[in-house]
């Protein structure tokens, strides 16, 4: 893993955005894996501020709630339109269909689509319990796109987007860990002290289903971008190297 520790959350978002921008610039066709939740919002704002040309980019999102139509205000389809797609046109954009009549069949369809496209770069966040996408603790490390039941901690974390906890869906369609690992490059962003324990396990623990993000250690092209709070439980030597790496990142681009 290549770990960068930025001074602020905004700097961490800027690093991740810059990496994405550099990868897609000048390419004829590019497949970009996108995420939802609070982590990527600042980056999507940067896409809009720069009017980044994504006309040659096909996007695939990690997951979608089951039971919500694409136009439901809390669906991830609506999230992506409101925060990115309505202002930054992509060549094509794909998400799982949350209101598909057969979620299992939809998961299989989406797995096939993602595999055929081939993801060049996948953007990730990480949950407090170490989940990536909706791969909760206990998910098989070789899981493909599947239907998953959300843990109470994940539903509670997403409660802020709904009127009541009871309104938060209980299931979702998510890319599996094996699906994510098939991306050519991965950029994971984590900020804030609430993510510190999960980040520590992701980097320092042996790969385990108890902390799904630990599987990323086996990927040859992972960049982890943190702020100081998210890195605070990692070894001091790693924090120091990460801070130096973040400083170099900005210096060579000035």
Swiss-Prot record:
GO CC annotation, single: cytoplasm
Keyword Lipid biosynthesis: no
Pathway recorded for this protein: Amino-sugar metabolism; N-acetylneuraminate degradation; D-fructose 6-phosphate from N-acetylneuraminate: step 5/5
Catalytic machinery residues: 63, 129, 131, 136
EC code: 3.5.99.6
One Pfam family linked to the record: Glucosamine_iso
Swiss-Prot/TrEMBL keywords: Carbohydrate metabolism, Hydrolase
Superkingdom per UniProt: Bacteria
GO molecular function: glucosamine-6-phosphate deaminase activity; identical protein binding
The UniProt record lists the keyword ATP-binding: no
Any GO BP: glucosamine catabolic process
Record field: catalytic activity: alpha-D-glucosamine 6-phosphate + H2O = beta-D-fructose 6-phosphate + NH4(+)
HAMAP family, sorted: GlcN6P_deamin
Family: Belongs to the glucosamine/galactosamine-6-phosphate isomerase family. NagB subfamily.
Its biological purpose: Catalyzes the reversible isomerization-deamination of glucosamine 6-phosphate (GlcN6P) to form fructose 6-phosphate (Fru6P) and ammonium ion.
Protein name (record): Glucosamine-6-phosphate deaminase
Species in which this protein is naturally found: Exiguobacterium sp. (strain ATCC BAA-1283 / AT1b)
Biological classification of the source: Bacteria, Bacillati, Bacillota, Bacilli, Bacillales
């Amino acid at each position: 893993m290549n770990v960068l520790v930025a001074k602020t959350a905004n700097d961490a978002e800027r690093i991740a955005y810059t990496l994405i921008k550099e990868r897609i610039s000048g390419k004829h066709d590019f497949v970009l894996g996108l995420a939802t939740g609070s982590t990527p919002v600042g980056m999507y704002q940067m896409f809009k501020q720069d009017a980044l040309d994504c006309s040659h980019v096909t996007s695939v999102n990690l997951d979608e709630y089951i039971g919500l139509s694409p136009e439901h205000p809390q669906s991830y389809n609506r999230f992506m339109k409101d925060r990115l797609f309505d202002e930054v046109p992509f060549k094509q954009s794909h998400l799982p269909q949350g209101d598909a009549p057969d979620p299992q069949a939809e998961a299989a369809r989406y797995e096939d689509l993602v595999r055929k496209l081939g993801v060049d770069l996948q953007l990730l966040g990480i949950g407090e319990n170490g989940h990536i996408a909706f791969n909760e603790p206990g998910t098989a490390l070789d899981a493909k796109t599947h239907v998953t039941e959300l843990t109470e901690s994940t539903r509670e974390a997403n409660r802020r987007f709904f009127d009541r906890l009871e309104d938060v869906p209980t299931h979702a369609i998510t890319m599996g860990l094996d699906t994510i690992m098939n991306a050519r490059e991965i950029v994971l962003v984590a900020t804030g002290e609430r993510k510190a324990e999960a980040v520590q396990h992701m980097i320092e623990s042996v790969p385990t289903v108890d902390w799904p993000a630990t599987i990323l250690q086996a990927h040859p092209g992972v960049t982890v971008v943190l702020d100081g709070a998210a890195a605070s439980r990692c070894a001091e030597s790693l924090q120091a190297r990460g801070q130096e790496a973040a400083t170099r990142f900005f210096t060579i681009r000035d």
